[in-house]
Swiss-Prot record:
Organismal lineage: Eukaryota, Metazoa, Chordata, Craniata, Vertebrata
GO-annotated molecular function: melanocortin receptor binding; neuropeptide hormone activity
Protein species of origin: Colobus polykomos
The protein, known as: Agouti-signaling protein
Gene3D superfamilies associated with the record: Agouti domain
InterPro entries xrefs: Agouti, Agouti_dom, Agouti_dom_sf
Amino acid sequence: MDVTRLLLATLLVFLCFFTVYSHLPPEEKLRDDRSLRSNSSVNLLDFPSVSIVALNKKSKHISRKEAEKKRSSKKEASMKKVARPRTPLSAPCVATRDSCKPPAPACCDPCASCQCRFFRSACSCRVLSLNC
């Protein structure tokens, strides 16, 4: 009985090894440069060459300054977009994150809206967009 179990275990190991080995892609052995050129489907001369240039400290500072200028111009542009006249606040309104069940008045913040959950049982004023 032990011999048959040992034989079955050995057979199982060989089957596992054969299954794994059969799914591995075969390795191509290239003997020289000529076979590499004949087997490759893409010609390496078609691609442009790449040149590596070392940056000196002055060019690094210039690029940092340019990056800062770009960042500041983007911030200024976004600030210009955000600035818009706000409507005058009316006295009866609901503050942000306070309850605003349907008979309640509108939210005080013009960017906020009344959000209800659980079948309109829990409602609160929330700001949905950060750019507003």
